[in-house]
Every structure is written in structure tokens, then in C-alpha cells.
């Protein structure tokens, strides 16, 4: 599980990855606000969710966050440092999240994935997630700027995971 001292590193990893995969969102994010949210999430770990990290050679290389809503677990974040991808870090984090969710009473895990984020979709599909058909657009329009992100809903049943 993540420690309070991990919040700045999680923020750095998330923002660096989002500048690559979600630049339209990343440009609007304030690093201090993101770090505050991670500090709060780490402090509040327990029955409502967990934040997991993966370290290699004392460096944070992956993070996953799960939130519980009754029998549902929401995978709210799964990020791996680009230079460490395809080394099973994401798979291990996702398996740990599934174990934690199952022990917390969840029967399935879902995630909202940007429709343009094909690598994330393919990764989740390779681990048993399927598209549910649900979509959403999130963001804001304030006259001066616009941020809209089209997302698709993906889920997996924990009973069917190997």
C-alpha cells in the first residue's frame, strides 16, 4: 500500500503519463491539487479503497487505485512508467487490486477508459475486461476553454478471473 511520502511520486508519475496519453486533460491539471488528492486518498485507505505502488530499485514505477462501491470496485487509476511497461508491472498491480477488491466483497471491477487510449483498452482486454457498451463524455466548457474526454466503460467479473 502507498505511504504518505508516495503522494508526490504518484503525482509525478500520473502527470508525466497523462502528458503522453491525455495531453488535453493534463494541461488543465494543477500538480498541487493532484498531490492533495493523492495525499487524501492515501490517508483514507481502508474500507473505501486502496492505493498500491510498485517500486524498482527504490524508484516508484507503477501505481494503481481502487475505490469500493458495495459489490463494485472502480479501478480509478493504473499507471506504469513508460520505460517499465511490458514488464508485468501493470498486470501485477491489477492482480493485487483484484485480490483486494475480492476480499472487500466486490464481485466485479470496472473502469472508465478514454476512447482514444487504445493501449489501455488493449491491456485491460488482455486481462479479462470487456466493453460494456456504456460511454460518457466528461469535462467542461467555459467559453474561454474546453476540455471534453470521451470514455468507454469496461468491466470484469472477479469470479471469472484466473
Model-inferred region functions:
Residues 80, 86-99, 126:
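Conserved acetyl-CoA-binding loop-helix of GNAT-fold acetyltransferases
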Residues 39-53, 74:
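A short helix-loop-beta-strand connector motif used in the catalytic cores of GNAT acetyltransferases and
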Residues 53, 59-67, 74-79:
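Conserved beta-strand in the GNAT
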Residues 1-12:
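A short beta-loop-alpha structural element at the N-terminal edge
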Residues 101-113:
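Conserved GNAT acetyl-CoA-binding A-motif
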Residues 71-82, 91, 112:
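Conserved acetyl-CoA binding element of GNAT-fold acetyltransferases
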Residues 15-40:
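Conserved GNAT-fold acetyl-CoA-binding loop/helix
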Residues 112-113, 121, 130-146:
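Conserved catalytic-core motifs of GNAT/GCN5-like acyltransferases
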Amino acid at each position: 500500500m502507498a505511504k504518505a511520502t508516495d503522494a508526490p511520486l504518484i503525482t509525478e508519475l500520473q502527470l508525466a503519463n497523462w502528458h503522453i496519453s491525455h495531453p488535453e486533460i493534463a494541461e488543465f491539471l494543477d500538480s498541487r491539487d493532484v498531490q492533495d488528492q493523492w495525499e487524501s486518498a492515501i490517508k483514507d485507505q481502508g474500507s473505501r479503497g486502496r492505493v498500491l505502488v510498485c517500486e524498482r530499485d527504490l524508484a516508484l514505477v507503477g501505481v494503481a487505485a481502487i475505490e469500493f462501491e458495495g459489490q463494485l470496485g472502480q479501478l480509478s487509476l493504473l499507471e506504469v512508467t513508460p520505460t517499465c511497461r511490458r514488464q508485468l508491472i501493470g498486470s501485477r498491480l491489477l492482480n493485487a487490486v483484484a485480490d483486494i477488491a475480492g476480499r472487500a466483497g466486490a464481485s466485479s471491477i470496472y473502469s472508465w477508459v478514454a476512447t482514444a487510449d487504445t493501449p489501455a483498452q488493449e491491456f485491460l482486454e488482455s486481462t479479462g475486461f470487456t466493453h460494456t457498451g456504456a460511454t460518457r463524455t466528461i469535462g467542461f466548457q467555459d467559453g474561454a476553454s474546453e476540455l471534453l474526454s470521451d470514455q468507454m466503460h469496461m468491466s470484469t467479473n472477479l469470479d471469472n478471473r484466473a
